[in-house]
Design a protein with these regions (language model features):
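Active-site lining segments that contact anionic ligands and/or coordinate catalytic metals
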Residues: 119, 152, 199-201, 227-231, ...
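General small-molecule cofactor/ligand-binding pocket signal
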Residues: 123, 177-179, 391
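Long, K/E/R/D-enriched contiguous segments that form extended
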Residues: 107-111, 117-120, 125-136, 140
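Non-catalytic terminal extensions of PLP-dependent enzymes
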Residues: 1-121, 246, 301-302, 319-465
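Conserved phosphate/anionic-ligand binding catalytic regions in large, soluble enzymes, centered on
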Residues: 57-77, 125-133, 264-279, 307-311, ...
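Mobile "lid/hinge" segments at catalytic clefts and subdomain interfaces of large enzymes
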Residues: 273-342
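Conserved PLP-enzyme active-site core in the AAT-like
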Residues: 101-104, 131-297, 373-374, 401
Length: 465
């Protein structure tokens, strides 16, 4: 399929525009080269992007078990709510009395999310998860500085953490202390005690953790950090496993970010902007980014205006639709689906941890790689030929040849059974003809790419002939 830059004919246009009826303002800056834009009809443009859409894979056209990403179905009624003229047609600089409905959306969303998480206050400014992490860490830093405690310069992060955790801590000006996990994938309490000291600003943790297990020592973990004078930050990436069942605030966490585009069903992965609201306990409220008014201790705005408002509307519609009973039921079904798949595959594929998982599970293909030279990459690519999006590959880093599978609660048993059969048939094919998997995928519009060259010599813009 040609790039859109390779299509068209000079002089062809979509629309005829009237002559400009206002004076032309000369800005005194001119291009050195002609602007190389394609010239196509509307029909050609429509066909081009419709063709691209047909090649894409999303939750609307196939199973999408991308671990740690919660690629659940996005209810279309939420899109209708966000498209209402009173929400879609407003401007953040309108007079306050004309946007009271929008302000009510923020108020309700804050109430419900605080109830779900056990927090006392929330900001919706952060644009997505990592932005939320950065904002939450700035709250922790502002808190310690307000107490004159300038020596707390380190953030503790487990070795199984999302890569954004240490990156966000570094951006916030902290040094990162990584602590190893135990063999069961959970936090090593002895190593944590050794790491906590007078220079500890806080701990960043996901629970359930990145290998899909709930750390039963969570109360002891947060107590150790608090006793050392640090604060506890909850990465909400895996909240979909426990939403409405257990609250991070009750586990001892002081700050949390949520991914509305994961747990609360708003589109992501190319389907729309994210939203990473940050919640906190009452003692951290003064440091939040200002909403209507910025207090003297506020860290200041982290995004223009109020954040991605339309995403908040969709998440609020989701919460109100499911209600107090539906939200924990969704989490329970997410856990049930993950355990069903794990148990149906465990006789062939080696699981990284032989325990009941939460919302996702991790396989290790280390034995296959060693015995027949079939890697996690080969299995993942083969799934594409069956219309299944690959699981997350080679993550978490503490598991060799990892595939992380998260089916989510919105998949039916029939879909899970079909996916299980595909996984099993690929395994048998790998055993019978391992070389064939090195060529996969063979049925997709684009075959296997040279990812090493793409990473080392990326072509980031169209250059032309």
């Amino acid at each position: 399929m040609k790039l859109i830059f390779e299509k068209g004919t000079p002089g062809r246009h979509c629309h005829l525009l009237p002559d400009c009826d206002v004076p032309v303002h000369q800005i005194g800056v001119g291009r050195k080269e002609k602007l190389n834009l394609p010239e196509l009809s509307e029909n050609e443009i429509s066909r081009h992007y419709t063709g691209l859409a047909g090649r894409a894979h999303g939750v609307n056209n196939g199973f999408y078990p991308l671990g740690s990403c919660t690629m659940k179905y996005n209810p279309k009624v939420n899109e209708e709510a966000a498209s209402l003229e009173g929400f879609a047609g407003i401007h953040p600089l309108q007079p306050e009395h004309t946007v009271r409905g929008a302000l009510r959306v923020f108020d309700l969303a804050e109430q419900y999310l605080c109830e779900i998480t056990g927090m006392d206050a929330m900001t919706f400014q952060p644009a997505a998860g990592a932005h939320g992490e950065f904002t939450g860490l700035l709250l922790i830093k502002a808190y310690h500085h307000s107490r004159g405690d300038e020596k707390r310069t380190k953030i503790i992060v487990p070795d199984s953490a999302h890569g954004t955790n240490p990156a966000s801590a570094t951006m916030a000006g902290y040094s990162v202390v990584s602590i190893p996990s135990r063999e069961d994938g959970c936090v090593d309490l002895d190593k944590l005690k050794e790491a906590v000291g007078e220079d500890t600003a806080g701990l960043m943790l996901t629970n359930p953790n990145t290998v899909g297990l709930f750390d039963k020592n969570i109360l002891e973990i947060t107590r150790i950090v608090h006793d050392g004078g640090g604060l506890c930050y909850y990465d909400g990436a895996n909240l979909n496993a426990v939403s409405g069942i257990v609250r991070p605030g009750d586990m001892g966490f002081d700050v949390i970010h949520l991914n509305l585009h994961k747990t609360f069903s708003t589109p992501h992965g190319g389907g729309g902007p994210g939203s990473g609201p940050v919640g906190c306990k009452e003692f951290l409220r003064p440091f939040l980014p200002g909403f209507m008014v910025k207090g003297p201790q506020s860290i200041g705005s982290v995004k223009m205006f109020y954040g991605n408002f339309g995403v908040v509307v969709k998440a609020l519609a989701y919460i109100m639709t499911l209600g107090r009973e539906g939200i924990p039921e969704a989490s329970s079904n997410a856990v049930l689906n993950a355990n069903y798949m794990m148990n149906k595959l465990s006789d062939l594929y080696q699981m990284a941890y032989n325990e009941t998982c939460m919302h996702e599970f991790v396989m290790t293909l280390e034995d296959l790689k060693h015995d027949i030279n079939v890697s996690a990459m080969d299995i993942a690519k083969a799934l594409l030929d069956y219309g299944i999006h690959p699981p997350t590959m080679y993550f978490p880093l503490i598991v060799h040849e990892a595939l992380m599978v998260e089916p989510t609660e919105t998949e039916s048993k029939e879909t899970l059974d079909e996916a299980i059969e595909v996984f099993r048939s690929i395994y048998e094919k790998a055993k019978a003809d391992p070389q064939s998997l090195h060529q996969a995928p063979v049925k997709t519009p684009v075959r296997r790419l040279d990812e090493v060259t793409a990473a080392r010599k990326p072509v980031l813009r169209y250059i032309g002939e």
